[in-house]
């Protein structure tokens, strides 16, 4: 059996996923890294009104929602390439993060979350008793 293949179909599908379409908006791009005793996550949200941002946390899942409203229908649009509608992204956080003290800041189209490392996840010393009852500290 022969299957006809278009070599550009996969490339076209990949491009649509990156740029998004009206029916399926592009994903909220993000970067995440550890900076000392905290994790930092940045989401690119250009053109999003700060009032439309919504952050929720339930257990260890952070949900970020934002909305870019539709274009005024009275406009005669010549091009409509920017994704519109509601955007949503969820992050599952590990138990080693302190979800009670998340700091969120939105500036210049970038939403930045700073999530501190939980105290229970930080290195600490544990005392070890010897047979003669002397204590020696080791790193854990």
Swiss-Prot record:
PROSITE patterns on file: SHSP
Gene3D superfamilies, per database record: 2.60.40.790
Family label: Belongs to the small heat shock protein (HSP20) family.
Pfam family, one: HSP20
Residue ranges annotated for the sHSP domain, each copy included: 21-131
Membrane-crossing segments per the record: none
Function: Not known. This protein is one of the major immune reactive proteins in mycobacteria.
Disulfide bonds: none
Superkingdom of origin: Bacteria
Lineage, opening ranks: Bacteria, Bacillati, Actinomycetota, Actinomycetes, Mycobacteriales
Name of the protein this chain belongs to: 18 kDa antigen 2
């Amino acid at each position: 059996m022969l299957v006809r293949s278009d070599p550009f179909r996969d490339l076209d599908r990949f491009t649509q996923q990156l740029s998004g379409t009206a029916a399926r908006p592009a994903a909220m791009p993000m970067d995440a890294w550890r900076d000392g005793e905290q994790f930092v996550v940045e989401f690119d949200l250009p053109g999003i009104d700060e009032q439309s941002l919504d952050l929720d946390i339930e257990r260890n899942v952070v949900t970020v929602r934002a909305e870019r409203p539709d274009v005024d229908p009275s406009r005669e649009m010549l091009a409509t390439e920017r994704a519109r509608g509601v955007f949503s992204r969820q992050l599952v956080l590990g138990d080693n993060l302190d979800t009670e003290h998340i700091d969120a800041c939105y500036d210049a189209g970038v939403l930045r979350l700073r999530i501190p490392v939980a105290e229970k996840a930080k290195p600490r010393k544990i005392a070890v008793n010897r047979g003669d009852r002397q204590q020696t500290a080791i790193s854990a």
